[in-house]
Amino acid sequence: MSTSLAVLRLDRELPMPARAHDGDAGVDLFSARDVELAPGQRELVPTGIAVAIPHGMVGLVHPRSGLAARVGLSIVNSPGTIDAGYRGEIKVSLINLDPHAPIVIRRGDRIAQLLVQRVELPELVEVTSFDEAGLAETTRGEGGHGSSGGHASL
């Protein structure tokens, strides 16, 4: 099943977002300007594009795994969420996680990837208890934040 995505190029000199390989889930997003990030620094970087995410879908902006592994470049709010109603320029909140070296990004560098996925839009219903709502108790209950173990050394 194929769905189209309307892309508005705000900066015609930058490449159109594209998949690096046939079948890739994400399309590469490019930096619209030069940026230097000191260790620990974060910055909102424009991409030079806007998109019209269809209703019932969401755009998710993820880090590029190679940049994260090689130089420590990541996204502060990973993944960044682009709602269907947003029509402004996509900007990526990048952060340099390397403790020692600055990261230099040049205009036109690939900085992130955009995935577009279907999303459920459930109606929110307030209840006074889950029992009242007919939702069975689970074995997990309220356990979270490491409650399942798995890290004996921590």
From Swiss-Prot:
Required cofactor names: Mg(2+)
PANTHER family found in the cross-reference section: DEOXYURIDINE 5'-TRIPHOSPHATE NUCLEOTIDOHYDROLASE
InterPro entries in UniProt: dUTPase, dUTPase-like, dUTPase-like_sf, dUTPase_trimeric
One GO BP annotation of this record: dUTP catabolic process
E.C. designation(s): 3.6.1.23
UniProt catalytic activity: dUTP + H2O = dUMP + diphosphate + H(+)
Pfam families in the record: dUTPase
Binding residue positions for substrate: R64, S65, G66, N77, T81, I82, D83, K91
Family membership noted in the UniProt record: Belongs to the dUTPase family.
Additional comment: Each trimer binds three substrate molecules. The ligands are bound between subunits, and for each substrate molecule, residues from adjacent subunits contribute to the binding interactions.
Highest taxon of the lineage: Bacteria
Subunit organization: Homotrimer.
Name of the protein described by the UniProt record: Deoxyuridine 5'-triphosphate nucleotidohydrolase
Entry's Gene Ontology molecular function annotations: dUTP diphosphatase activity; magnesium ion binding
